[in-house]
Amino acid sequence: MGDQSKDIILSIRGMSKSFGRNRVLDHINLDVRKGTVMGLMGENGAGKSTMMKCLFGTYQKDEGTIYLDGKEVNFSGPKDALENGIAMVHQELNQCLERNVVDNLFLGRYPVNSLGMIDEGRMKNEASELFRKLGMTVNLDQPMRNMSVSQRQMCEIAKAISYNSKVIVLDEPTSSLTVQEVDKLFDMMRMLRDQGISLIYISHKMDEIFEICDDISVLRDGNLVMTKSAKETNMNELITAMVGRVLENRFPPVDNQPKDVILSIQHLSTKYEPYLQDVTFDVREGEIFGLYGLVGAGRTELLETIFGIRTRAAGRVYLNHKPVSYTHLTLPTKLEV
């Protein structure tokens, strides 16, 4: 990446963190350039989230030094990090769903007027101006519960920007988004990058990493094993860095032969919201059955209905070709569901 020390906005030196005898981070050195997107990759358990939580003050590092804009910093907690220019948008959004957009934006830092009362007019004005600059049209009075995951995520990013953040960490932000929503998110990220804000983008999705990132770093077993410009690396090199070996066959042939149907779901519908409608599928013995969908699609509700937690409105569940009757929760467990 050359000599770019004058462009470094965030520098981590020798960061280590252990939980008991488990060494999660081992003397990590990482630089993030101003006005760039740094992709952070690694297998599950590599240390990505722990590293960012140490940066954000959620965890306290055991060793190491953090420099922000050339100055050494050590945050006592997330509030301290936010007030000093580092924000983090978690994969699981931390929002009060029953409150509106404005309340969530100013939660914990409500402005007050000369009488010591919450200045709601100022809050709305500042929120409107913030979303205008971001090119977003948002109903400020709308409860967060009524917004899509994508809209809620954009609001969380707007909140991070409202702290005048220099660095924003995005922890797998596209895991619950559609292709169109990902495009909107990337447009916003490019706009922030052009404004000089640096972003750390955690993801497992290679195509997205190469589309949006300027630099890419890889963690493996708590060690930083690679940092390169996105233009100077490729997918195979990233995979090798992540797993620690060359994968000769990324998609080996499957020779497993599933046997007879062991679980059959027929025309399953639920009685209460969120509704399931006419769900039918079979699971065979010795088969790994994948269940895919975005947040809110009904995956959890489906499994809870099969297990007997939710009430069925229609449909049947068959185990070993015999209908299952749910009278209480102990029955499914006795039937090995």
Model-derived regions: residue spans:
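Glycine-rich phosphate-binding loops of nucleotide-dependent enzymes
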Residues: G2-L329
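Single conserved hydrophobic/aromatic residue that forms the stacking wall/gate
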Residues: H328-V337
